[in-house]
């Protein structure tokens, strides 16, 4: 394959390049915008490639922030200076949101979450501070000529994630790069062309994973989210565990590794089962996180049902080792594995973990709600215990979560999670569970077609009740409204009945 030597720079960006050149300054496109263009591959007849339209673009320059602002203003619809102290000015230029940063070096001192920034005047020095060779490729914003001092194009072609220079130094400069390495390996990999870190980069990460403690929750969350939403999320999660990074992101997840399950229901341990569920659910942010957390409560609720080999008495114990029967003193052996209440324990763990990573409250509530309810669909058995219409209405209503006008979670999301969970079940049980799932889904769809079950409420509001009973405000109102709402859900009271 011919090596790409030049990019076709779109008009808005090339005009910026021209403005900077006329003012005596350099302007180079850098980072993801160049990497993505190079990954598209060269044209058939020429070693050139067009930049994709309508995307964000990063650029680097020898101009300092005040000069950048002056040069941007004639071309920008909007201009932002939030990152000015780090040398970055952002602007909306045509279809692009451009971030232009002064050539610089930056380093995070141990224990600090803020980099020490020094401005420079040399492109190659600026590229040398970048994390990986695939991100250390620049293209002249005016001519499109590529500058590649660290052979990033070659590594893109080979599918290699390689640090620029010494991997230990690059990770020390900014420990978030350890998560970024996993993210790039995960998101860039395709079936026909996988990406992999170099052994020395993996070693630097594995030996220094604890450096992540100095990184803010928000920055860790952004990288974790990108890994989790990737089509190769399971590979990324495995790598986070293998390289020792997961303890600094979601440490509770490490507890799922090698936790056995009842073979009749699950043929994989909790960790492997979780990966199957994550890969089986669509890449929607709330659903992916619900899949990731859905069984995280199992390790802390693990119990073994023992049976006495002499008198047959049953007992529940935390250990799989043989024990002594409390009734007759005989020997007990483990027969079954249980995780009673793991959904509620898991919901609490998910809430704490997401709060620790500074997720928005709505996201935290939605995910913990889905985790807490993820066992509900298993209470429905098509062949022996199908629910009444009232029970299905209650299921729909109970699994609905909203804040104001914003819907956070609903029965559709829960059923998608349940369907993915079934995919990770043992083959024989899977067939039975799939039949019940289809039957429940059909009943849910049928009932929702008749009415907006999620919005069913008491036909009488607080004012109606105070007027009818001649009483003032108090707790009695909520109790009575809940009772009336329940009657509506059960079907014994119409949603518009006022009498």
Regions found by a protein language model. Give the residues of each.
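Catalytic cores of the polymerase beta-like nucleotidyltransferase superfamily
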Residues: 1-499
């Amino acid at each position: 394959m011919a090596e790409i030597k030049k990019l076709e720079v779109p008009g808005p960006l090339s005009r910026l390049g021209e403005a900077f050149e006329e003012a005596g300054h350099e302007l180079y496109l850098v980072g993801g915008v160049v990497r993505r263009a190079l990954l598209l591959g060269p044209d058939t007849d020429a070693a050139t490639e067009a930049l994709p339209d309508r995307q964000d673009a990063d650029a680097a320059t020898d101009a300092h922030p005040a000069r950048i602002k002056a040069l941007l203003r004639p071309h920008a619809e909007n201009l932002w200076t939030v990152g000015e102290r780090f040398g970055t000015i952002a602007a909306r230029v045509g279809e692009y949101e451009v971030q232009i940063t002064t050539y610089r070096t930056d380093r995070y001192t141990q224990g600090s979450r803020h980099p020490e920034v020094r401005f420079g005047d040399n492109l190659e020095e600026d590229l040398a501070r970048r994390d990986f060779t695939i991100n250390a490729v620049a293209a002249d914003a005016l001519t499109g000529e590529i500058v590649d001092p660290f052979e990033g194009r070659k590594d893109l072609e080979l599918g290699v994630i390689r640090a620029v220079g010494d991997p230990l130094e690059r990770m020390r400069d900014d420990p978030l790069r350890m998560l970024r390495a996993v993210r790039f390996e995960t998101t860039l990999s395709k079936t026909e062309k996988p990406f992999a870190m170099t052994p020395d980069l993996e070693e630097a990460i594995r030996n220094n994973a604890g450096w992540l403690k100095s990184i803010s929750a928000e920055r860790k969350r952004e990288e974790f989210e990108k890994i989790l939403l990737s089509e190769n999320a399971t590979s990324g999660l495995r790598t986070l565990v293998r390289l020792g990074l997961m303890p600094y992101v979601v440490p509770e997840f490490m507890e799922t590794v090698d936790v056995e399950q009842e073979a009749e229901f699950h043929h994989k341990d909790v960790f492997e089962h979780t990966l199957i569920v994550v890969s089986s659910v669509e890449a929607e942010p709330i659903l992916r996180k619900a899949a990731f957390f859905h069984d995280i409560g199992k390790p802390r609720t693990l119990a073994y049902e023992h049976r006495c080999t002499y008198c047959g008495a049953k007992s529940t114990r935390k250990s799989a080792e043989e024990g002594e029967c409390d009734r007759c003193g005989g020997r007990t052996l483990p027969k079954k594995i249980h995780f009673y209440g793991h959904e509620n324990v898991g919901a609490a763990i998910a809430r704490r973990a997401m709060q620790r990573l500074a997720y928005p409250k709505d996201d935290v509530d939605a995910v913990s709600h889905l985790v807490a309810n993820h066992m509900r669909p298993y209470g429905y058995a098509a062949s022996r215990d199908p629910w009444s219409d009232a029970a299905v209405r209650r299921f729909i209503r109970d699994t609905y979560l909203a804040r104001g006008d914003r819907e956070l979670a609903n029965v559709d999301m829960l059923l998608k999670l349940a369907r993915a969970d079934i995919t990770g079940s043992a083959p024989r049980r899977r067939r039975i569970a799939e039949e019940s799932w289809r039957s429940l889904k059909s009943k849910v769809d049928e009932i929702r077609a008749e009415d907006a079950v999620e919005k069913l409420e008491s036909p009488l509001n607080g004012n109606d009740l105070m007027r009818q009973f001649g009483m003032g405000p108090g707790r009695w109102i909520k109790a009575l409204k809940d009772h009336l709402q329940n009657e509506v859900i059960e079907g014994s009271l119409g949603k518009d009945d006022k009498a």
